[in-house]
Structure formats: C-alpha cells, structure tokens
C-alpha cells in the first residue's frame, strides 16, 4: 500500500502481520463541531461509515447527521435507529457530547452540578447501553469515551466536570470487564489543553499560564485527539480494554 492509498480501497488486505482494515459503522456524539468533528472526519477519512449527532444545529454536508439530546433516553434510541437504517448497527461509538458549567465549589448549585453529570456521564451511559445491544449480538464493539485531563488531575472550579470525566474511566473499565469476552471493549481518550473555539476565547494570560503545566510547551490539536480515537477504533486495538490514553502533552502525567 502506498502512502497515497485510502485504507477503504485496500479493505480486506492484511499487510506485514497487521489485521486487514474493516470499514465499520461509527457514531460520534456531538460530532458536528470541535473535537467531535475532527474525530468524525478522521474516521471517515480512514474509510469508516460515520454518523454524528447534533442538538439541532445540523451536521456538515460530508457527514450523516442525526438530531439527539443525550439527556433523553428516547431521543438516544431514535438517533440510533436512524443511524442503523442509514448505515447498519453501530459498531464503534465515540461518546464525545459534553458541556461545561464551571463555578467555585461554594457557588456551584446542585442544578449546575447535575446538568453536567447528566450530559457528560449519564448521557455517555445512555449511548453506551444502547450501542451494546447490537455490539454483543455481533460480538464486536468499540466504545470510546472522550474524557479529559480534568478527570484525572482535578482542575479547580470543575467539581462537576471533573467528576463526570473521572466517572467515564470507571464506566469504561466496568464495561470492559463485563463485555470484553463478547468482543466489546471500552476505553477513554483524555485530551488536555486543546486548540478549540472555547480555548481560543480564553484570556491570553490564561492561555499562556496553561503552558506552564504542559511539558510539551504547546497546545494540542483536535486532529491529535482524533488520531488516538482512530487507533482505538481500528483492528489493531482489539486487545486494549479499560485503558486511558492521554492526549495532553504530558500535562496529566502520573495521574
């Protein structure tokens, strides 16, 4: 295979001991912008069939979009049914949809705490539970949660966000212990300080200060996060289960 070949064009061809590429049905929640969009486009470029969820803003023309609110179990079920009709049962789930509602601990309301947990953690659970139905029947599945360095490091003013992202690690490991024997694995990709619209909007002093905690001394890109997801979605990652892969320039080392 030359460097210009598309993996989809060489499906079924194993090379140098590597397993053959298999095009999978992929769903990326919150895949219409930011890190989620970069992940969706990378997986599509890899040769997979990719659908993305959005909350009403639509999806880019090059991706199949379905409207979904991950805090609503019925909406999650409808979204999965749409994807199944369009490209078959979901074989790779990237649970990326999330929000942040930062506040000092003493000022954080229960409503704000629960809103983030419901979206970032329980929403991921709803999607993973729904995806696991067909994954177990097919005896293949990749569940990839998009976590955060905050879930390991515990960033201040993010009690809700850090708790949700830490919860994804426990959930991935529980799912893997339960379902890996059926060919279904769950892992976490934990981005650090990534160049997105949200981080670019931060005060320049905050941006500069963040680099003090990053050994690589630079901001990461959404495409670098997508690269880690691409690997976990591949046949090469079949023996990886319950792992946390940081994409943070060393920011969360040792946690």
UniProtKB/Swiss-Prot annotation:
Compartments reported by the entry: Secreted, Cell wall
Swiss-Prot/TrEMBL domain comment: Upon NADPH binding, several residues are pushed away from the active site, allowing the enzyme to adopt an open conformation. The transition from an NADPH-bound to an NADP(+)-bound form is likely to facilitate release of the product.
Protein's organism: Mycolicibacterium smegmatis (strain ATCC 700084 / mc(2)155)
Pathway given in the UniProt record: Lipid metabolism; mycolic acid biosynthesis
Name of the protein: 3-oxoacyl-[acyl-carrier-protein] reductase MabA
Protein family per UniProt: Belongs to the short-chain dehydrogenases/reductases (SDR) family.
Subunit structure: Homotetramer.
Record-annotated site: Important for activity: 148
Main location: secreted
Catalytic activity from the UniProt record: a (3R)-hydroxyacyl-[ACP] + NADP(+) = a 3-oxoacyl-[ACP] + NADPH + H(+); a (3R)-3-hydroxyacyl-CoA + NADP(+) = a 3-oxoacyl-CoA + NADPH + H(+); (3R)-3-hydroxybutanoyl-CoA + NADP(+) = acetoacetyl-CoA + NADPH + H(+); (3R)-hydroxyoctanoyl-CoA + NADP(+) = 3-oxooctanoyl-CoA + NADPH + H(+)
Gene name for this UniProt entry: mabA
Signal peptide region: none
């Amino acid at each position: 295979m030359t460097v210009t070949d598309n993996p989809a064009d060489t499906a079924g061809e194993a090379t140098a001991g590597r397993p053959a590429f298999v095009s999978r049905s992929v769903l990326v929640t919150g895949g219409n912008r930011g890190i989620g969009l970069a992940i969706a486009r990378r997986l599509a470029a890899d040769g997979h069939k990719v659908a993305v969820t959005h909350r009403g803003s639509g999806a880019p023309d090059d991706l199949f979009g379905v409207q979904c609110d991950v805090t609503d179990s019925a909406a999650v079920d409808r979204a999965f049914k749409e994807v199944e009709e369009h490209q078959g049962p979901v074989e790779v789930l990237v649970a990326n949809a999330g929000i942040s509602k930062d506040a000092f601990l003493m000022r954080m309301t229960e409503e704000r705490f629960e809103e983030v947990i419901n979206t970032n953690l329980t929403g991921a659970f709803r999607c993973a539970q729904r995806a696991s139905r067909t994954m177990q029947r097919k005896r293949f599945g990749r569940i990839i949660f998009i976590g955060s360095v905050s879930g390991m490091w515990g960033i201040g003013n993010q009690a809700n966000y850090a708790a949700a992202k830490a919860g994804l690690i426990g959930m991935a490991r529980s799912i893997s212990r339960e379902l890996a024997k059926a060919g279904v694995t769950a892992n976490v990709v934990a981005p650090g300080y990534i160049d997105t619209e949200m981080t670019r909007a931060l005060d320049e002093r905050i941006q500069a200060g963040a680099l003090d905690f990053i050994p690589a001394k630079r901001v990461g890109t959404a495409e670098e996060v997508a690269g880690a997801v691409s690997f976990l979605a591949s046949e090469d990652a079949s023996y990886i289960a319950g792992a946390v892969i940081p994409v943070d320039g060393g920011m969360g080392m040792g946690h």
